[in-house]
Amino acid sequence: MAGVMETDEQARQRFQLELEFVQCLANPNYLNFLAQRGYLREKPFVNYLKYLLYWKEPEYAKFLKYPHCLHMLELLQYEHFRKELVNAQCAKFIDEQQILHWQHYSRKRTRLQQALAEQQQQQQPQAPSHANTTSK
């Protein structure tokens, strides 16, 4: 039944489901599961992944808790990547790379925050001493 408008409640539910699903794409083991079950070879599913690219728009991306899911969504647009995901070693490699990225990101962010805090402390103006230097 084409042309039927969805209710606000239906739109909210669809938004929630698509948000959850897109974020699941950040999990390489889930991607491996989808590939091994054949979903990534099905044209309707591949078309759905293409449809979900709207999540890259800032008005939608701001709701994502795991923004690297967008990178996975982008990679899933390529047939070669979808085929490689059948291999558990591929999923394991992606998982390891994600862990390394977050470890490096966390350390770098902590160092940056410490450096900024030190810089702010050094830039704070010192209170002038109020020595009585009035001359008559």
Curated annotation (Swiss-Prot):
The record's subcellular location field reads:
Nucleus
Task: Select a single GO molecular function from the record's annotations and give it.
Answer: transcription coregulator activity
User: Looking at the UniProt record for this protein, which Gene Ontology cellular component terms does it annotate, in alphabetical order?
Assistant: core mediator complex; mediator complex
Region: Disordered, residue numbers: 117-136
Enumerate the Gene Ontology biological process terms. Answer: regulation of transcription by RNA polymerase II
Q: Which UniProt keywords apply?
A: Activator, Nucleus, Transcription, Transcription regulation
**InterPro entries linked:** Med31_sf (IPR038089), Mediator_Med31 (IPR008831)
Which stretches are tagged as biased composition: Low complexity? Answer: 117-128
Tell me the subunit arrangement: Component of the Mediator complex.
The UniProt family comment states: Belongs to the Mediator complex subunit 31 family.
Role noted for this protein: Component of the Mediator complex, a coactivator involved in the regulated transcription of nearly all RNA polymerase II-dependent genes. Mediator functions as a bridge to convey information from gene-specific regulatory proteins to the basal RNA polymerase II transcription machinery. Mediator is recruited to promoters by direct interactions with regulatory proteins and serves as a scaffold for the assembly of a functional preinitiation complex with RNA polymerase II and the general transcription factors.
Protein name (Swiss-Prot/TrEMBL): Mediator of RNA polymerase II transcription subunit 31
Organism, scientific name: Danio rerio (Zebrafish)
